[in-house]
A protein has these predicted regions:
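Short runs of predominantly hydrophobic/aromatic residues within well-ordered alpha helices
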Residues: 1-4, 96, 114, 138, ...
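Structure-specific DNA junction-binding interface
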Residues: 1-66, 235-238
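Generic structural signal for hydrophobic core residues of well-folded globular domains
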Residues: 5-13, 80, 103-106, 121, ...
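Helix-hairpin-helix/helix-loop-helix acidic hairpins
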Residues: 57-107
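Active-site-adjacent structural elements in folded domains
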Residues: 82-90, 98-104, 125-129, 168-180
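Helix-hairpin-helix
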Residues: 99-121, 141-142
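Low-complexity, acidic/Ser/Thr- and charged residue-rich accessory regions of DNA metabolism proteins
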Residues: 172-238
Length: 238
């Protein structure tokens, strides 16, 4: 399960997952072979198919000596699981931050990517960490926070995200907002972090005079025509 989560998240593209699934009996550590996976992905690239989602930038250095980003990511997975047996370490972690510190020490994994990975791991059944103890402000969130506050005082960016999480209900009431939860689940730290990121994107269009190192929206949203059947982590009990 952990291998599947990390493999999907490194590419973060459903069509890439389906491509691999169509070429192998199943996506598991038993079927994982760096050369075989690389061949499938390289063939897709040669046919003009994008294998990475551009929602966020994944690190693209040659940490494992390969010219292609996907080859370095496959080598990373091989080191994590076949050499280091990272799954044995992760399942023993008591907190999200503990797992974050393990993952972020690997090449090609920055702080925000490590946070995204541990968040997705925590949605699974293999661990059950608290979600309200740890967060990391990503690049978009940092820009969003900067556009909201002239002076943060002594608060860190993560402190601001935590404050938003802790005071959400009283602020909804104060602002007379009828906020619709997913089930009975309040906004979590990752949700508040994401809100600041989306705010940054919104402000680029709505208030372009606000200074930022990002000016344009790099991708336009195109809704799918097919109906989406949403599923939620079992532990949410929705």
């Amino acid at each position: 399960m952990l291998f599947r989560i990390l493999l999907f998240k490194l590419f973060n593209k459903e069509s890439t997952w389906e491509l691999l699934l169509n070429n192998f009996e199943d996506i598991t550590l038993k079927t994982f072979n760096v050369k075989d996976y690389s061949k499938v992905l390289e063939n897709a690239i040669s046919n003009g198919i994008k294998i990475y989602n551009d929602a966020y930038i994944s690190c693209a250095n040659k940490a494992f000596g390969y010219d292609r980003k996907h080859d370095n990511h496959l080598a990373l997975l091989n080191k994590m699981f076949n050499e280091d047996r990272i799954e044995e370490k992760i399942v023993k972690c008591n907190t999200m931050e503990e797992a974050f510190n393990i993952i972020k020490n690997y090449p090609l994994i920055g702080n925000f990517m490590a946070y995204q990975l541990v968040t997705d791991i925590n949605y699974s059944e293999i661990v059950n960490w608290r979600e309200d103890e740890f967060t990391v402000a990503g690049p978009g969130s940092l820009r969003g926070i900067k556009k909201c506050f002239i002076d943060k005082g002594k608060m860190s960016n993560e402190d601001i995200i935590k404050y938003m999480y802790e005071h959400q209900d009283e602020e909804f009431k104060r602002l007379n907002l009828d906020f619709k939860r997913i089930g009975n689940r309040p906004l979590q730290l990752i949700d508040c972090q994401n809100i600041f990121c989306e705010l940054d994107k919104y402000c680029r269009q709505a208030i372009p005079d606000l200074k930022s190192n990002r000016i344009k929206i790099k991708k336009r949203y195109s809704p799918k025509k097919e109906k989406i059947n949403y599923i939620y982590p079992t532990k949410w009990k929705i």
